[in-house]
Amino acid sequence: MSAHKTFIIKRKLAKKLKQNRPIPQWVRMRTGNTIRYNAKRRHWRRTKLKL
């Protein structure tokens, strides 16, 4: 990734950064909850973004 990024690329990277976090603990504590973890979690070295 270059140091000089276009704004569109930077905005996409910011969105992916926000998506790449674990689910909050209060979501797990909800009644009748089946979500255990974030299935769409991405590791920076294993899976690359298609930008």
Swiss-Prot record:
Gene3D superfamilies hit by this protein: Ribosomal protein L39e
PROSITE patterns, alphabetized: RIBOSOMAL_L39E
Keyword Transcription regulation recorded: no
A biological-process GO annotation: translation
Gene Ontology MF annotations: structural constituent of ribosome
Cross-referenced InterPro entries: Ribosomal_eL39, Ribosomal_eL39_CS, Ribosomal_eL39_dom_sf
Pfam families: Ribosomal_L39
Keywords: Ribonucleoprotein, Ribosomal protein
Gene Ontology CC annotation, any one: cytosolic large ribosomal subunit
Superkingdom: Eukaryota
Cystines in this chain: none
Family to which this protein belongs: Belongs to the eukaryotic ribosomal protein eL39 family.
Protein name: Large ribosomal subunit protein eL39
Organism: Plutella xylostella (Diamondback moth)
